[in-house]
Amino acid sequence: MTLRRVARALIVLPLAGISAFAVIGAAQAPAGPAAAGDPLIAGFKSTYAASVSDAVEIVTGKNGTMRSDMKLMAGTNMVGRAVTSLAKPAPAAQATATLAVKHSVEIIDEAKPGEVGVIVMEGTLDIAAMGNLMATAAVERGMAGMVLDGAIRDMWDIRRMGLTVYARAKSPRTAVGHYATVAKNIPVECGGVTVRPGDILVADEDGVVVVPQERASEVLKEAQSIDSRESGMYPFIRQFKSLQEAIKKFNRI
């Protein structure tokens, strides 16, 4: 249970004795456009990255959370299915303006509304995986956001657009002349976690979690169970003024 949620839940609103516990669900920021007719995406939008992180480990026995340097650079919460692109170092002749970002541009131009673009720049945090032109296209395609194992540039413009972007670094340096994409919609290692096309990414201020698509229903059910237990802990803590007793009773922290 995160301190953010405890603090939010312990605040009592001066309105007819109604506590913040009653409005926790309403206070959560939306996670971006939903893929039409995808109940799993809708379900994950009602939970938190922290709960989903715990749930992935419980269900799969493996970590699904990207490294802590995968930071929210722009936008807000994000949930969506992944589309992927991989870039590697390349000679200048093979890293032209077209080839440097070929597959990354393709996953954006082919994206369905609500999808999340995942771009991996193998071996560097000093070269930008995308800038404002690619971000503009992502917004126009209705993408939920982007996750970059690499750097981002043109932050001044991307923040203005409102596109959600997570990245490991910022750098103004171009990929042209240095890197070229080699494949799209393949499994990639992003932030220390394998991401496959169709996996569900759940991200908020805490970080980015990858939900394996074949276990998504189980993970969602577990995450909802975690949130339900935590919801019961808030009034217990207020009543008994003891976090230790709440942990013992609900077996949750």
List where the protein language model places each region:
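Feature captures the catalytic cores and cofactor-binding loops of soluble hydro-lyases/lyases
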Residues: 29-197, 211-253
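Intrinsic disorder/low-structure terminal segments
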Residues: 2-5, 20, 43, 249
